[in-house]
Every structure is written in structure tokens, then in C-alpha cells.
A protein has these predicted regions:
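Accessory nucleic-acid engagement/destabilization modules that flank
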Residues: 1-198
Length: 198
């Protein structure tokens, strides 16, 4: 199930008109579950950054945008998806995992695990790049279109509040394998994220 689906052009218009979060809230509440204030605030913040990312003439107006895609047979929700064609008309899907983290720390004794402040305390969670890559893997296994057509899946993480000069540990060499296949973009790297999408 996809909570919101449109073109890049309509996504930006919905954001600029102030109706995007309302549409997300209404659809998710009607079809799935109640939405808390913290999730609404999270959408407002992260999607403003994604609207800025998508305001690039090199990203086609008719590129597809999906928000809050619920992977079938799971409780996993993909934050942001961009779909489109390259210059050779090959289909591409870019999965973007959005985080508002300000700080995180490496965990050396577990693969692709980091620790960060969540829910009032420090918690161990998957590295955001690994989380995005795992969604690609799930979609490859559960989506018939991806299985039956030559659609290329790409993943990345966008931590728009994350200042690597203060908290550099998410790029520790222990995470190189996942960062090489699912890059991470942080505060001040919006142009790099745009280039990855293009």
C-alpha cells in the first residue's frame, strides 16, 4: 500500500500549498492507523527537505514520488520513493530513508548497527543506509513488477540534520560495505543527493 503517490510536480505543489501533510494524515488514518503528533512533525520537517531536493530542473517533472510505501507482508514503511526513466528509457527506483537524527554512534560488535537517541534514551538500531538497502531487498522479493521487469533499484539515506563534523561515526570503516551500495547524505549534502537521484 502507498499512502501518497504523485508526480514530482504535484508533490512540490502539494507541499507549497500546505496540503501534503494533511493528505498523508488523512489517508494513513483512513486506511491504516492513527497518526501521532510526532509523526506529523516528522513529515513536516523531512518532507520540506525532500521538496527542496526535488526542486531541480534535471529531475523530470513527471518523475514519480511515493511517500510511506508499506511493503507487502511486512510492517516496514519506506519513507520516500522516486521513480523514473533514464536517457535510455531504463526504469529506475530510488528509495530514500529519511532520518532527523542529530547524533549517532558506531556499535562495533554487531553488523550494520548504530546507536542513537530515540524515545527518550539511547537505542541500538540499524544503520540508515542498511535500512534503505533492506527495503530494496524486500521489494525485490515481494514486488511482481520488479521481479518481472528490468527495474533497477537504488537506495540511500538522507540525514538532513546530521552534522558529520560533530558526529562522524556513521562513516566509520566498519560501515564501508553498506555505504558503498547504499550511500548516506547528511547536512549540507543536498546537491550530492540530487546528483545521486539524477
Amino acid at each position: 500500500m502507498i499512502i501518497y503517490s504523485s508526480t514530482k510536480q504535484s508533490f512540490i505543489q502539494d507541499f507549497e500549498q500546505g496540503v501534503l501533510v494533511k493528505k498523508l494524515h488523512q489517508t494513513l488514518t483512513e486506511k491504516y492507523r492513527r497518526v501521532g503528533e510526532s509523526e506529523i512533525h516528522s513529515w513536516q520537517t523531512s518532507l520540506s527537505y525532500m521538496a527542496n531536493v526535488m526542486r531541480d530542473f534535471a529531475i523530470p517533472e513527471l518523475a514519480g514520488v511515493a511517500i510511506e510505501y508499506i511493503v507487502p507482508n511486512t510492517q516496514k514503511r519506506v519513507d520516500f520513493i522516486i521513480t523514473g526513466l533514464d536517457q535510455q528509457d531504463n526504469e529506475h527506483v530510488v528509495i530514500v530513508e529519511l532520518k532527523q537524527w542529530g547524533e549517532a554512534f558506531k556499535v562495533t560488535d554487531k553488523d550494520n548497527i548504530v546507536s542513537t537517541y530515540l524515545g527518550g534514551g539511547i537505542r541500538e538500531v540499524t544503520h540508515p543506509s542498511y535500512q534503505a538497502w533492506s527495503y530494496c531487498s524486500l521489494i525485490e522479493n515481494f514486488n511482481e513488477d520488479v521481479q518481472n521487469r528490468p527495474i533497477k533499484l537504488h537506495s540511500c539515506a538522507f540525514l538532513h540534520n546530521f552534522d558529520e563534523s560533530i558526529s562522524p561515526e556513521l562513516r566509520d570503516p566498519i560501515y564501508n560495505d553498506i555505504l558503498n551500495i547504499s550511500p548516506m547524505f547528511t547536512l549540507g549534502q543536498m546537491d550530492s543527493l540530487r546528483n545521486f537521484i539524477k
